[in-house]
């Protein structure tokens, strides 16, 4: 079965955001057009971030797919690691604040930033 690699941003038991990769089976369709199962969604939002944009540490408000449409996006974690997503890149962001926790910018969440010579355009689907 052909698969698609899904980058997942999630919250570990210690409350810190981490990256992991999962495989999404593309088990239907034709050899020229392999398809995954249909995933439910309830909305989407487009975002434009100018050159130089960088957020503060924050948690994902709700699990959502992030697709980079134009430019490059870097996502950084508390441990100093980061990933750069180029146009066409994607990530499933699910690093929500643990139940009962109070947000601590030195422990929880991730930051995101525009990288490269072009503004960043992203699509969020939840």
Predicted regions and their residues:
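Short acidic, Pro/Gly- and aromatic-enriched capping/linker segments at domain boundaries
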Residues: 1-11, 80
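A short glycine-rich, His/Asp/Glu-containing loop-to-beta-strand
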Residues: 13-57, 63, 119-125
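Glycine- and acidic-residue-biased ligand/ion/polar-headgroup-sensing regions
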Residues: 61-79, 89
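Short acidic-glycine-tyrosine-enriched beta hairpin
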Residues: 79-97
């Amino acid at each position: 079965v052909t698969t698609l690699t899904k980058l997942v941003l999630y919250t570990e038991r210690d409350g810190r955001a981490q990256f992991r990769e999962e495989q999404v089976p593309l088990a239907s369709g034709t050899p020229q057009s392999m398809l995954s199962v249909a995933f439910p969604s309830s909305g989407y939002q487009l975002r434009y971030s100018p050159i130089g944009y960088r957020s503060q540490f924050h948690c994902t408000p709700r699990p959502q797919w992030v697709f980079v449409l134009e430019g490059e996006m870097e996502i950084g974690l508390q441990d100093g690691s980061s990933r750069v997503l180029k146009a066409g890149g994607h990530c499933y962001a699910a690093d929500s604040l643990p139940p009962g926790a109070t947000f601590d910018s030195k422990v929880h969440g991730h930051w995101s930033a525009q990288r490269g010579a072009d503004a960043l355009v992203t699509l969020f689907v939840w």
